[in-house]
Amino acid sequence: MALRKTHPLLKIANDALVDLPAPSNISAWWNFGSLLGLCLATQILTGLFLAMHYTSDIATAFSSVTHICRDVNYGWLIRNMHANGASFFFICIYMHIARGLYYGSYLYKETWNVGVILLLLVMMTAFVGYVLPWGQMSFWGATVITNLLSAVPYVGNALVQWIWGGFSVDNATLTRFFAFHFLFPFVIAAVTVIHLLFLHETGSNNPAGINSDADKISFHPYFSYKDLLGFIIMMVALTSLALFSPNLLGDPDNFTPANPLVTPPHIKPEWYFLFAYAILRSIPNKLGGVLALLASILVLMLVPFLHTSKQRGLTFRPLTQILFWTFVANVIILTWIGGMPVEHPFIIIGQVASFLYFLLLLVLSPLAGWVENKALSWA
């Protein structure tokens, strides 16, 4: 028998990457899981090389990033790949979640819930990472977002000062954020293994949403090569962005060193957090906004329990398809609103879009599933 099937270590890899039975009809939407693995590996690698030259001290952090870009061999490339790699990470994660929502993959509850935890970890990692260059938006973003914890009743202020390590965002804050930013990707890698462990208990879902045991093919060579094609497409796109317009998705304010005495005119996070930021801002109450922000992500954990349809995916459900694409459009609108100033008409658009975000997920989708069941029973 082949060594890969008998060796204690190799057989784990073999069962996950070589002899894994996979549905023969899974589309390119099933590529994003492996792409996220590639993103994580790329981010850890580029991040490691950046950490070799970065200093987590408020006096030198900004200069050390400048030094990386100017003086370190290919430092500019490593930094641009890392910064834009984060954007690609989130593009892939949102596509991966959208695929899960569309095809009913969330019915694998353990896999789905571990996935939501992974999303929270990635968001947390990206947030602390954005603070590290110690530019204006780094500093003020850290100040604004950590300040939200002061909305927690009774312990809020103590909590904020505990996280800051003082009475404001200062050196202690930057140092601990660097420590967290270095640590979390390895935690993410560990949780990813758990995510895969649960997935391999059930096997992959497929676009038809039906049992595929009768028609399985081996992961290698079919999907290993399919994943490789995905890798090539993504890496070409990432390197193109990093080489041709590395600052396209960044904020110009972050080219100015952090200054606690000057507040930027518009404080906003990176594009991938704007939808949640818009939901946060749409509620004119601090605690309410914080709860809505949390709910915007945690609502995903409720999705499996709100599945009413007799069918798994949306492939043959035109009514819910309309709701799904409305939801996608709505998230895009929220992303746009999150980057806009708090003034008319953006305030009301943001409030309507935020309301619609929760309405679509919690009320309309389960309702549509029920209606479709009724329609099927009449047919």
From Swiss-Prot:
Q: Which cofactor does it need?
A: heme b
The question of whether Electron transport is a record keyword is answered with yes
As for membrane topology, the entry says: Multi-pass membrane protein
Where in the cell does this protein reside? Answer: Mitochondrion inner membrane
Q: How is the cofactor bound?
A: Binds 2 heme b groups non-covalently.
Q: Which SUPFAM superfamilies match?
A: a domain/subunit of cytochrome bc1 complex (Ubiquinol-cytochrome c reductase) (SSF81648), Transmembrane di-heme cytochromes (SSF81342)
Residues at which heme b b562 binds: H82, H181
Q: Name one GO cellular component term.
A: mitochondrial inner membrane
Q: Where, in this chain's numbering, is heme b b566 bound?
A: H96, H195
Major place of residence: mitochondrion
Keywords, in A-Z order: Electron transport, Heme, Iron, Membrane, Metal-binding, Mitochondrion, Mitochondrion inner membrane, Respiratory chain, Transmembrane, Transmembrane helix, Transport, Ubiquinone
Q: A Pfam family in this protein? A: Cytochrome_B
Is Metal-binding among the key words of this record? Answer: yes
Q: What InterPro entries does its record include?
A: Cyt_b/b6_C (IPR005798), Cyt_b/b6_C_sf (IPR036150), Cyt_b/b6_N (IPR005797), Cytb/b6-like_sf (IPR027387), Cytochrome_b (IPR030689), Cytochrome_b_C_euk/bac (IPR048260), Cytochrome_b_N_euk/bac (IPR048259), Di-haem_cyt_TM (IPR016174)
Please list every transmembrane segment annotated in the UniProt record, as residue ranges.
32-52, 76-97, 112-132, 177-197, 225-245, 287-307, 319-339, 346-366
Residues annotated for a ubiquinone binding in this entry:
H200
Identify the Gene3D superfamilies for this entry. Answer: Cytochrome Bc1 Complex, Chain C
Q: What does this protein do?
A: Component of the ubiquinol-cytochrome c reductase complex (complex III or cytochrome b-c1 complex) that is part of the mitochondrial respiratory chain. The b-c1 complex mediates electron transfer from ubiquinol to cytochrome c. Contributes to the generation of a proton gradient across the mitochondrial membrane that is then used for ATP synthesis.
Return the similarity comment. Answer: Belongs to the cytochrome b family.
Additional note from the record: Heme 1 (or BL or b562) is low-potential and absorbs at about 562 nm, and heme 2 (or BH or b566) is high-potential and absorbs at about 566 nm.
Q: What is its quaternary makeup? A: The cytochrome bc1 complex contains 3 respiratory subunits (MT-CYB, CYC1 and UQCRFS1), 2 core proteins (UQCRC1 and UQCRC2) and probably 6 low-molecular weight proteins.
Stated name of the protein: Cytochrome b
Species of origin reads Chlorophthalmus agassizi (Shortnose greeneye)
Lineage, opening ranks: Eukaryota, Metazoa, Chordata, Craniata, Vertebrata
What gene name does this entry carry? Answer: mt-cyb
